C-alpha cells in the first residue's frame, strides 16, 4: 500500500506523534473526524488560529473550522478524492502562517507552523506539493508575491502577497528562473481579510478572480476589472464594506454566490450581458445599493440575490427571466413597484417579505403559485390583482398587507380563485361547498376546523396545499377530483374520523405524513399512475388492514406505513419494476437493494432478502414471532422497534449488523440468539426488552454501545467475551436485576455510567 508523500516548504513542518504512522490514501474516508492542535515552531504554547481550511488542490472542498483558545481544532472530511491541504490563517486574514500540506487520518496531530515572513526573509524561493498520482504543483515567490506556476502553459495564479496594505499592483507578467509567465488569475483567498488594502490594480490578462479572494477587505473602496475577466468567484468581494463602485466588464459570464455580499457602500451595479444567472446572495445586504441593471441574458435570479438591499427603489426584471427563487428581494424596504414578467411560473416563499414600501405589484398570467410569506409585511400594498392562472397560495402569503387586512368578514376567504382560509370559528357539523371555478385550496386553508364534517370540491380544483385539512378531526369523507396530482405534506394529518377517501387517477405523489394519524381509515385504493409515496405517509393509520401497491410506484420514503399495526395483507402489483411481494410474502421488497421495506404480522420473509430495512416492522403490535432467513446480513435501525408482543426471533448466522433501536421496546421478547458473526450492535438495540433474562454477546463484537440494554429489567446475567474492548455509557443502565457480569478479558474500557442503577453489579 503506497504512502502519500509530499515535498513541503522548509519554512514549515508538520509533526505527528512518534507512535503514529504516516497515513495512507485508503485511510482517508468520508466522515472521518480530524482533530489536532496548532503550536508555533520551537514553542509549546498553543496558538489561537482563525480557521483551518480543508480543501483539495483544486479547491473543490472548503470548510471553515475555528480553533479554541488552546489551538485545538476538529472537522469532518467531506471528500477524500484528492490530496487534502490545510491552511491556517490569523484572525485578520494576514498570512501569519504559511501553507501546510498533509495527509490526515483519525490520528491526533500537532501542526507546527513557522511564521510566514515573505520572500525577503525567506531564502526558499519555491515549494512543491506532489499528488499521489504524480502531478506536481509549483509555488514561487517573486517580488513579494506568491504564485502557483504552470510550466506547461507558462501561466501563473497569484496566490498571496506579503504586503497587503495600501494599493497593490498585480503585474501582467512575471519572470521566474529566466522564464516569462503570464499572470492569468487571482487564486482563492489571495487577499482574504486584508483590511489595510485600499486599492488594487488588476491588469489585462487576468481571466478569473477566485473564491473569497478579497473577502473582508474593508478598506478597499473601488475596483476596476479589466476586459478579459470571465469569472468572479464565490464571495470574491464579500464583506468589502468600503467598496463604492466596481466596474464589471462585458466579458464576465459568471459571478459566484455571495460575490458582493455585505458591500454596504456599493451604490450601483451593472450586470454584464453575458451573465445568465444571478447566483444566490450575489448582492445580499448591499444596503446602499440604489440601482441595478439586469440584462436580457439573465434567465434566473437566485435566493437572497438582493435580500436586504434596503435602498433599492426600483428594479426592472427582464422578460428573459423564468425563475426567481425564494427571498430574492426580501427586505428591500425602498422598493415601490414590481412587474413579474411573462414566463415566471412561481412567486416563491418570502420573495418580497418585508418590502414595506411596495405599493404596486403586477403579476403575469404565467404565474400559477404564490409561496408562503411571499408578500408578508408589505404594508403598502392596498390592492393586488391575482390572475386566474394562480391555483396555489402559501400560508401567510399576504400577511400584514393593507389589501388583505381589509377582508374582515368571517367565513371562507377566496384570494383570486383560490380557497385561501376559513376565518373565525367554524360551526359544528359544517359542510363546505367550494364555488365552481375554484382552482386551488391554499396551505392551512381549513387547518383545525373541528366543525368541518364534509366538503365538496369542484372538478376545477387542481391543487391542494400542505396541511390544508390537518386536524379536521370530524371530517369523515372526501373525494379528490381528477386533475389533482399531489396530496401534500400533512394535508390530512390527524383527521381521526376520516374513514373514506377517493383518490383520482391523475394522482402521482403522496407526500410525507399526508395521512398521519388517520386512524379510522380501513382501506385506501392507490391509483395506477401513482409514482411516489412519501416518508411516513400513512403513519399510525391503525385501522388500515391491507395495502396494495400499483405497478407505477417507483419511489417510497422511509417507513411509509409506520405504525399501521392493523395491516394483515400487503400486495405489490407484479408489473412493478422497483418493488415486489414475491410468493405472497405479505411484504414490500426493494428488488434492487434486496431490502424488505415494509412488513406486517403475516409476513414470511422470502429468500434473497439481504437487509431488513429501517422501521420495516416498527409498532407491528400483532407480530409475535419472526424467522429471518439465511442471507440477511443487516437488521436496520428500528426494524422491529415497539413490537411489544414479539416473543421469538430467529436470526441466521449470516447477520453481521444490528442497527440502532432494532428491537427496542420489544417487551415480550424473552430470548434471542445472536450469531457470533455479528460485529456491530447499534445504540439502544435492545433497550426496554424487559423480558430478556440472559444475553450472549457475540465474539466478534468490539464495542457495546450506549443504551444497548437500557431498561432490560429482567436481565440477570451477562457474559462479556474478550473481544469486547469498550462499553458505552448507560449500556446496562436500569438493569436492576443484573446480578452476574462475567468478563473474559481484562483490557476493556468501561464508561462511568455504563452500569448505572444496577444495584447488583460489582467490578
Predicted regions and their residues:
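Structural signature of tandem-repeat unit edges
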Residues: 151-152, 163-185, 195-208, 218-231, ...
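Short, ordered, surface-exposed loop/turn motifs in non-cytosolic proteins
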Residues: 32-34, 41-57
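Short, surface-exposed beta-strand/beta-hairpin micro-motifs centered on an aromatic residue
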Residues: 68-77, 189
Amino acid at each position: 500500500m503506497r504512502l502519500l508523500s509530499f515535498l513541503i516548504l522548509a519554512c514549515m513542518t508538520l509533526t505527528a506523534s512518534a507512535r503514529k504512522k504516516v497515513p495512507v490514501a485508503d485511510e482517508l474516508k468520508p466522515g472521518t473526524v480530524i482533530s489536532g492542535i496548532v503550536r508555533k515552531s520551537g514553542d509549546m504554547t498553543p496558538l489561537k488560529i482563525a480557521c483551518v481550511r480543508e480543501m483539495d488542490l483544486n479547491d473543490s472542498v472548503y470548510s471553515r473550522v475555528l480553533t479554541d483558545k488552546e489551538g485545538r481544532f476538529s472537522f469532518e472530511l467531506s471528500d477524500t478524492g484528492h490530496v487534502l491541504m490545510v491552511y491556517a490563517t490569523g484572525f485578520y486574514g494576514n498570512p501569519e502562517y504559511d501553507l501546510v500540506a498533509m495527509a490526515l487520518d483519525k490520528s491526533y496531530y500537532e501542526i507546527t507552523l513557522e511564521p510566514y515572513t515573505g520572500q525577503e526573509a525567506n531564502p526558499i524561493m519555491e515549494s512543491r506539493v506532489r499528488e499521489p498520482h504524480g502531478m506536481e504543483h509549483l509555488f514561487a515567490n517573486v517580488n513579494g508575491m506568491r504564485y502557483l506556476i504552470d510550466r506547461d502553459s507558462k501561466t501563473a495564479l497569484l496566490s498571496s502577497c506579503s504586503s497587503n496594505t495600501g494599493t497593490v499592483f498585480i503585474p501582467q507578467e512575471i519572470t521566474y528562473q529566466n522564464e516569462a509567465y503570464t499572470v492569468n488569475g487571482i487564486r482563492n483567498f489571495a487577499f482574504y481579510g486584508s483590511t489595510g488594502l485600499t486599492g488594487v490594480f488588476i491588469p489585462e490578462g487576468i481571466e478569473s478572480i477566485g473564491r473569497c479572494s478579497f473577502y473582508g477587505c474593508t478598506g478597499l473602496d473601488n475596483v476596476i476589472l479589466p476586459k478579459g475577466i470571465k469569472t468572479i468567484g464565490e464571495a470574491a468581494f464579500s464583506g468589502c464594506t468600503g467598496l463604492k463602485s466596481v466596474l464589471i466588464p462585458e466579458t464576465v459570464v459568471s459571478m459566484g454566490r455571495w460575490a458582493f455580499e455585505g458591500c454596504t457602500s456599493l451604490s450601483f451595479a451593472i450586470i454584464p450581458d453575458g451573465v445568465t444567472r444571478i447566483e444566490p446572495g450575489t448582492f445580499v445586504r448591499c444596503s446602499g445599493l440604489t440601482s441595478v441593471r439586469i440584462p436580457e441574458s439573465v434567465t434566473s435570479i437566485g435566493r437572497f440575490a438582493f435580500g436586504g438591499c434596503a435602498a433599492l427603489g426600483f428594479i426592472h426584471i427582464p422578460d428573459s427571466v423564468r425563475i426567481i427563487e425564494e427571498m430574492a428581494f426580501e427586505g428591500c424596504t425602498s422598493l415601490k413597484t414590481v412587474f413579474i414578467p411573462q414566463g415566471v411560473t412561481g412567486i416563491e416563499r418570502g420573495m418580497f417579505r418585508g418590502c414595506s414600501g411596495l405599493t404596486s405589484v403586477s403579476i403575469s398570467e404565467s404565474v400559477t403559485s404564490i409561496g408562503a410569506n411571499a408578500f408578508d409585511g408589505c404594508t403598502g400594498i392596498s390592492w393586488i390583482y391575482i390572475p386566474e392562472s394562480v391555483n396555489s397560495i402559501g400560508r401567510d402569503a399576504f400577511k400584514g398587507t393593507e389589501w388583505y387586512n381589509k377582508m374582515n368578514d368571517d367565513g371562507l376567504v377566496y384570494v383570486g380563485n383560490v380557497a385561501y382560509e376559513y376565518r373565525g370559528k367554524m360551526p359544528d357539523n359544517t359542510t363546505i361547498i367550494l364555488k365552481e371555478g375554484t382552482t386551488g385550496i391554499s396551505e392551512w386553508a381549513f387547518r383545525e376546523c373541528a366543525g368541518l364534517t364534509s366538503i365538496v370540491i369542484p372538478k376545477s380544483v387542481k391543487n391542494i396545499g400542505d396541511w390544508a385539512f390537518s386536524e379536521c378531526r370530524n371530517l369523515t369523507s372526501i373525494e379528490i377530483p381528477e386533475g389533482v396530482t399531489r396530496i401534500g405534506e400533512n394535508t390530512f394529518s390527524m383527521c381521526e374520523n376520516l374513514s373514506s377517501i377517493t383518490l383520482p387517477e391523475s394522482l402521482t405523489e403522496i407526500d410525507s405524513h399526508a395521512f398521519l394519524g388517520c386512524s379510522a381509515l380501513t382501506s385506501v385504493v392507490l391509483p395506477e399512475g401513482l409514482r411516489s409515496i412519501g416518508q411516513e405517509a400513512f403513519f399510525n393509520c391503525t385501522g388500515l388492514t391491507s395495502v396494495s401497491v400499483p405497478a407505477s410506484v417507483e419511489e417510497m420514503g422511509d417507513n411509509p406505513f409506520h405504525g399501521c399495526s392493523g395491516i394483515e395483507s400487503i400486495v405489490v402489483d407484479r408489473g412493478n419494476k422497483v418493488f415486489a411481494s414475491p410468493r405472497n410474502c405479505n411484504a414490500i421488497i426493494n428488488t434492487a437493494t434486496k431490502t424488505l421495506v415494509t412488513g406486517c404480522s403475516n409476513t414470511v420473509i422470502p429468500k434473497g432478502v439481504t437487509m431488513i430495512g429501517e422501521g420495516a416492522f416498527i409498532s407491528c403490535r400483532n407480530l409475535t414471532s419472526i424467522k429471518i432467513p439465511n442471507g440477511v446480513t443487516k437488521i436496520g435501525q428500528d426494524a422491529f422497534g415497539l413490537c411489544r408482543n414479539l416473543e421469538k426471533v430467529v436470526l441466521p448466522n449470516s447477520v453481521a449488523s444490528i442497527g440502532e433501536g432494532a428491537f427496542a421496546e420489544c417487551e415480550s421478547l424473552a430470548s434471542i440468539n445472536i450469531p457470533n458473526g455479528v460485529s456491530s450492535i447499534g445504540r439502544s438495540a435492545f433497550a426496554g426488552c424487559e423480558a430478556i433474562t440472559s444475553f450472549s454477546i457475540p465474539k466478534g463484537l468490539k464495542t457495546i454501545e450506549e443504551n444497548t440494554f437500557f431498561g432490560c429489567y429482567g436481565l440477570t446475567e451477562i457474559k462479556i467475551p474478550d473481544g469486547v474492548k469498550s462499553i458505552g455509557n448507560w449500556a446496562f443502565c436500569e438493569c436492576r436485576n443484573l446480578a452476574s457480569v462475567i468478563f473474559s478479558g481484562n483490557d476493556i474500557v468501561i464508561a462511568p455510567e455504563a452500569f448505572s442503577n444496577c444495584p447488583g453489579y460489582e467490578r
